[in-house]
């Protein structure tokens, strides 16, 4: 069981929703079906979420720091600025988004 502060849980809901929408809209063009999955890990000091798909992957020149995608800019801001975490997007048999966030030592607001 994982109990998260309400703000962290809300941020993660937005992030996961946005990543799934990106997979559906951009990853499976011209295909009838595809796979989207989510893997989570907990460590003593944080959480790792990895959302993945088996779609066409990111463009060769993709750069998260230079993206014009509003959704990805929002994700980047939520992860880094609001939750003090890190995000990586990379190709591996489709697209993978790896998000690492620290645990809140105070427990946050519920």
Q: Model segments located where?
A:
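Conserved short strand/loop->alpha-helix "switch" segment adjacent to the catalytic nucleotide/phosphoryl-transfer site
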Residues: 1-20, 24-36
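Short beta-strand/loop element within the Bergerat-fold HATPase_c
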Residues: 33-45
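Solvent-exposed beta-strand sheet faces enriched in polar/charged residues
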Residues: 39-41, 52, 88-90, 100
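A generic structural signal for beta-strand entry/edge sites
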Residues: 44-48, 94-96
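Conserved glycine-/histidine-rich ATP-lid loop and adjacent helix of the Bergerat-fold HATPase_c
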Residues: 74-84
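Glycine-rich ATP-binding loops of the HATPase_c
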Residues: 83-90, 96
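Short C-terminal beta-strand
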Residues: 94-105
